[in-house]
Amino acid sequence: MQTELFEVDPLSDNRKLYARAAEALGAGALVGIPTETVYGLGADALNPEAVARIFEAKGRPSFDPLIIHVHHGSEVEKYTAVPEGLKDLVHTLASRFWPGPLTLVLPKADIIPDIVTSGLPTVAVRVSAHPAMRGVAKALGRPIAAPSANRFGHISPTSASAVQKELGGSIEMILDAGACSEGLESTIVRPVLDEKGKPSLELL
């Protein structure tokens, strides 16, 4: 397989490119997509066969769940089943930290395939601050499952060239937006209800 590389010009309107990447994802392709933290290996999160290709390409164990990316915090309700007692906390976190490098682990909605969560009842959700990830997610109209775009156990890539070196020939497309601004994985927290039914946070 030949991996196509497309440059994302920060000074241009990239909507046609994002639409092209979204079309590829919709057809079951894998696409390397930049975020502000690291490059992600994207697949249509609602397509179990495409998600299975992520595990295959990365050599990732099937028991290791994936993060999903959505275009906007308002979409979280579609893909999660947050209990009433946690909704205010989740809304506060989303309003304060999204878009940005924060991942929330929340009870999943039935629409999310079990392969994404490795059979767990929760799903990790994020809204990236990078225009490429958000733009592709918006164009796709569905969540993007996207762990780091590298072989399992290797260093997470912060450039398109690193993605090409790791996964070139096993994925269809890479969007090259230069180096990631953060270069570190996102912070992961799980909102929970304590024994008294009060909302709190667990840092994962």
Residue ranges: model-predicted function:
Residues 1-204:
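Active-site-adjacent structural elements in enzyme catalytic cores
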